[in-house]
Every structure is written in C-alpha cells, then in structure tokens.
Amino acid sequence: MYLKIHETKDGNIVAACDKELIGKVIEDKNGVCIDLDKYRNFYTGKIVGEEELAKALRNFSSVNLVGKKVVAVAVKEGLIDENDIRYINTIPYIQIYQI
C-alpha cells in the first residue's frame, strides 16, 4: 500500500492507494474516472503496512483512499461503514472530510 501525507495549514490530507493500482486509469460506464497514472504523485509517498496506514488515519483533515486493501483498513478502524464505500468499476474508493 502506498501512503502519502500532504501537510497543509488546515491539517493533513491522507492519500493511500493499493500498490498494484498505481499507473492505471480506472473508469466506469458513466465516465467516472480516477487516473492513477497522471496523479500517481498524489498517492506515492512510501510503501506501508496496515498498522502504519491505520496510524495515519487517526490524524487527518481529509482522506482519499483507492483500493480494496486501503479501504479495508478504514473499515477495520471504524472510520467508515461498508455502506459508505463507492466503487469505480469494482475498485473501492472513499473520501472523508472532517468539518
């Protein structure tokens, strides 16, 4: 799993993606698209395990997760419910914002 934390004046943006998805363009029949090739730098900070991603998910202003593994960590940590998950084709995708 890739994890990148973008530090901003408003808090941390946590971006994480399943490693095998980087470099791919995921699109559904309605034209919804995530370009993990063009925007790879948004996600590719360092390779981490479940524990390090879970720790990063405890301190954020927003979260952007793409892939089965990273989304499963958010579910396990209680940040989201299975019903909150959106899919682009068969790839789970989640955005969380703290207001």
Locate each region found by the language model.
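C-terminal structural segments of small proteins and small subunits
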Residues: 73-97
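Conserved mixed alpha/beta catalytic, RNA-binding, or beta-rich assembly cores of soluble enzyme
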Residues: 1-61, 65, 84-85, 94-98
